[in-house]
Amino acid sequence: MRKKVLISGAICVALCSILLCGCGSASAESGSGSGITITNVSYDPTRELYAAYNDLFENYYEGEKGITVNVIQSHGGSGSQARSVVEGASADVVTLALAHDITLIEEAGLIKPGWIDEFDRQSSPYTSTIVFLVRSGNPKNLHDWNDLINEGVAIITPDPKSSGGACWNFLAAWEYARRNISEDEEAIKDFMAALYANVTVMDSGARGATTTFVENGQGDVLLAWENEALQTLKEYPDEYEIISPSVSILAQPSVAIVDENAEKNNTADIAKDYLEYLYSEDAQRLIGTYGYRPSDQSILQEFSDKFDLGMTLCTIDDFGGWNAAYDIYFKDGGIFDEIYER
């Protein structure tokens, strides 16, 4: 396999940890008229969503409870963000790309066991899936996963070692191969090795991968969160197309209170209110507007013209849940490493 370009998120994570630690301990206390500040450590492509949601929540909370709230956002590759919290970033809440990243914070003693049942729908207020973003006219004629292994196709995808979206990308491709090529693991590995041989750049997070594809003009196809692809179409309506592969995956980002930090910062109640409000009708409609699939199925149907609701989607349960999937595919020495090092 030829050498890839790997862009590390380590520097970004270190800076994020320093900045959030510096502001977190003093930020969350309610002062005389100064209100309350909480920090949301999130994954890469949620910047626009949470900028809008924070305004919605802040206005709601001041109107309902007379309390001024300021929400600080932090964004990066989901795995890197989880590690930054473990290493000291003072997050009151985390809104990450996959449950396993929150489990890492739980295992560090910062989040109480049972967090996945604290909020509705397994603490997943919105979902997404994985699609292909191609240039207008689809010049390489890419329609499904098997087209991505063709000679001369340049793929852009983030690195599963730092990006939650990249893990969803990998699993969606794996499930396609299992259903359409062979159930034999070695045959699936061969397919995945051919696919990753065509990856030319691996950024540390989904937004970085989008920048590589869109701003820098590299690659023929971006393996993208559906919401990120929709955002790109909104910004560049005549330059790109979304391709829905025959098989993808129901990506379920997760949210949780970072209990130890929230208790220390005296923000536990408002942190809970902040995450609960994601399930309100107003927030669910905002979520749909920003290209995420509302977890409220009735509101999701209001966006049926925006999302391809007929896609065949596997789920993380098809891989035994996130803890099992992470150990098999993404831990050091796992299947991803085996494939990538071929």
Question: What name fits each language-model region?
Answer:
Residues 137-143, 162, 175-183, 261-269:
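Short helix-loop capping/hinge motifs at secondary-structure junctions, enriched
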Residues 28-162, 340:
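N-terminal segment of the mature folded domain
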